[in-house]
Amino acid sequence: MEDLPILYSFRRCPYAMRARLALFISNTKCELREVSLKAKPEQLIKLSKKGTVPVLHLEPKKIIDESLDIMVWALKNHDPGNWLPKDTITMEDTLSLINNCDSEFKHNLDRYKYGPRFNVEDTTIHRGICETFIKDLNNRLHDHTYLMGDTASLADYAIVPFIRQFANTDGEWFYNTPYPLAHKWLDKLLASDLFLSIMTKYDPWHEGQTPIYFHAEC
């Protein structure tokens, strides 16, 4: 097969999930290299100083190592689901919502889910801050089926991996919160063929193995 982009990924990482979602829906053929976070391959570390996933290696001296940038790059090449907003106002709203997810929500999600790692004794404080974001999503869903309209778009797929992580931290608590529209939105996206397709389990990549090709037609 011709030289293809190489995606360094980790199945359960929400940043890597959002990258895989966009690459898959755009039918961007690439080689998938599953990474063990406990034994990151030397090739990944050489490519990106951050040493974190996802990293998309496009050519010898070109990489994309920010998940949202990978999404936008893939969708600008091919966007059959019309994920990218067509007007400036909706795009600005989309990016603002994603930024809220990636900044305040993710900061507090980490301290809720991994309290001891951050020396947090009362994780419910951080859960409560995260809850305000869930409330915002629920309010948006009063007006339409998805966050930006009646079809799923960039905002939904960039954010849903993080809401999945939040919900899985304490599912009983999450599904007893008064945000039924957010619950329904999450469940619908997680049960979709698209999401299930990007969650296939693979062993960690090692040098010399048979390549795994990741795209919508495989």
Each PLM stretch: what is its role?
Residues 125-129, 177-191:
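Extended, well-ordered alpha-helical scaffold segments
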Residues 22, 192-195:
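A structural signal for the main folded, soluble domain(s) of proteins
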Residues 202-218:
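Acidic/histidine-enriched, glycine/proline-rich intrinsically disordered or flexible terminal extensions
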Residues 136-137, 167:
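Alpha-helical transmembrane segments in multipass membrane proteins, preferentially the mid-helix core
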Residues 1-131, 138, 143-145:
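GST-like domain detector, emphasizing the conserved glutathione-binding G-site
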Residues 139-150, 194-199:
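Surface-exposed helix-capping loop/turn segments at secondary-structure junctions
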